[in-house]
Structure formats: C-alpha cells, structure tokens
C-alpha cells in the first residue's frame, strides 16, 4: 500500500491534513489521490480543533475503523508517518527538504504537536540541536529589573503564554510568535545574546512559530535546565528538560 500525504497548517493552530492511498499498480496510473477504479483506493481529510479532537471526511473504499491507531503526526515542519512496518520521515528546514526512508517498524504514539514547539522533537533524547542566526543585542531594560507590562495577551496554552507569566509579565505582551521574540526584545531594549542564565528566556526561530522556554538554571557543566509549555505534550502542558552546553549555544537568550 503506497500513500501520498499532503499537510497544511493554519496559522491559528488548526491543522488540516489530507491522505490518499492506493496499491503500487494503481499508483502508476494515478499518483494524485483517490481512484474510483481501484478497490483499495481512498482519500480522507481531517481537521483538529482547539481541543485536539479529530474530525474526518472520507472518500473511496476505506473507512475510519481501518485507520492504524499507532500513527504519530508531528506538526511544525517535522512529520513522521508509520504505515505497514515502513516509516517515512520528512524534515523541513526553511527552503531545504530532506527525505529519509527506512523499512524498520517503529513504535509510535498519538501525540499532537501544535504551534510553538520549536526545534525538531526527538523521542530518544531530551536534547535538541538547532541553528540560529547571530542574536541581536541591546541594552537598557532587563527581565530581572523590569516591571509588569500588563495583561498576558498571548494565546493560552502556548509557549509564549507560559513564559510571559513565568517572568512575571516583565516583557512585552505583543511580541508575536516565539520566532519574533529575539528581535522584538532587542528592539525594546532587552539584552539578547547566546549566553544562558537563570531567569532568562531561551528562544529559537526553528519550527513553524518558533519556540521559547524559561531558563530555570545553568549547571556546573554548562548544561541548561528549562521549563516550557506545549513542547512535545500538547497545548497547556508544562514540562522541563536539560539541554547540553554545546546545544545551548545555538539558542538565543533574552535577559
């Protein structure tokens, strides 16, 4: 069974994905989706609402009861699809695309990764490597000596919402998506560099919306402990991880 996958992600966090499948012979005749002359051909679309509920629309000779329940879908430019002991991985990094194929069956779970989950998520490591441009730098205001800017205007459940509250609201409430935070912070007078420090905000432009986390502390070996929301466990879920010193140098830090 060969599958063709097309994914579209809405800016509001609502995801729509379309799948089409048919056998290898049919694929040679029709590579564009559902074929009414193919007994195994089908296509379907589904949307995911704000509560993470799936809503399906089906066309063809298949039905939802046949959908494999151990598929994992990752959004924000990192997609993994596991079907019939075959795993297809697509990594998107700006304008570059890398496709890997392996015949090894992999265990997968139903996890929903929504906007703001930064760098490529790994199920085998708590460390993530990203590459960012040189951090802009400015001086004047600081998180430690700042004052609350007002109400939290970021989307509830997202990484930006959590970090704003975690720093006591002592940053701008209209900096936009996490990918924009470093430049917005520098423009507002905060110092932005690649040096981690307890109480700082870790930021990356990786992912569809970028990602931000709160720096809880820096260990003696240079590794960085962060807490964050909506990273690998869905909107509204706060988790923590430790990032190696080498990898931490690839992030921006807002002070």
UniProtKB/Swiss-Prot annotation:
It is found in: Secreted. GO terms for cellular component: extracellular region. Residues 134-255 form the Peptidase C51 domain. It comes from the Bacteria. Keywords: Repeat, Secreted, Signal, Virulence. Pfam families: CHAP. InterPro entries: CHAP_dom, Papain-like_cys_pep_sf. Residues 75-101 are annotated as: 3 X 4 AA repeats of Y-N-N-Y. Sequence repeats lie at residues 75-78, 88-91, 98-101. Residues 1-26 form the signal peptide. Not known; immunogenic protein. This is Staphylococcal secretory antigen ssaA1. It comes from Staphylococcus aureus (strain MRSA252).
């Amino acid at each position: 069974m060969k599958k063709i996958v097309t994914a579209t992600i809405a800016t509001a966090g609502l995801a729509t994905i379309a799948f089409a499948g048919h056998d290898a012979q049919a694929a040679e005749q029709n590579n564009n989706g559902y074929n009414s002359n193919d007994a195994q051909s089908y296509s379907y679309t589904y949307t995911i609402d704000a509560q993470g509920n799936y809503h399906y629309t089906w066309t063809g000779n298949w039905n939802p009861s046949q959908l494999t329940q151990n598929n994992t879908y990752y959004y924000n430019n990192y997609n993994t699809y596991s079907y019939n002991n075959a795993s297809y991985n697509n990594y998107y990094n700006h304008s570059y695309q890398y496709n890997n194929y392996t015949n090894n069956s992999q265990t997968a779970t139903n996890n929903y990764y929504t906007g703001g989950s930064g760098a490529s998520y790994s199920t085998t490591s708590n460390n993530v490597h990203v590459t960012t441009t040189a951090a802009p730098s400015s001086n004047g205001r600081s998180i430690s000596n700042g004052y609350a800017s007002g109400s939290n205007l970021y989307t509830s459940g997202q990484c930006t919402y959590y970090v704003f509250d975690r720093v006591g609201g002592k940053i701008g409430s209209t900096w936009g998506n996490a990918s924009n935070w470093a430049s917005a912070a520098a423009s507002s007078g905060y110092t932005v560099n690649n040096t981690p420090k307890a109480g700082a905000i870790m930021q990356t432009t990786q992912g569809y919306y970028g990602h931000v986390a709160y720096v809880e502390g820096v260990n003696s070996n240079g590794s960085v402990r962060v807490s964050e929301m909506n990273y690998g466990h869905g909107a509204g879920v706060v988790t923590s991880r430790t990032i190696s010193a080498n990898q931490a140098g690839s992030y921006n830090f807002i002070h």
